[in-house]
């Protein structure tokens, strides 16, 4: 009888531990979405462990860009450096890219992957871009920071 009670307590204790662990899994798996004062949103999908990208650094990235659907999901892919097999390089914070990129890539570490959700005001705005990006489009980019030169 005493042994049965001990086994039941052990099993109950293990069940509590398992349930607690399962409840924490979604929290650990979902990265926190950050919204900046400008309206840019980003999620670090992978935090790198290399140099930190700062304004005026020359950075090398791979990226894929999508139009955002009305429900917030990724829509049509419109560009990808990965598809071309050619990383994209630019001077960070110098206005060589859309504002959402200048803001969103800063603070990344080499090896990191960040999803940027860029509102129209930080992207191509009312004009759109080259018939590929419509006016007032919200853009989603997945950016991998490959290298930084200070």
Go through each PLM region and give its residues.
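Cross-family detector of peptidyl-prolyl cis-trans isomerase
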Residues: 2-150
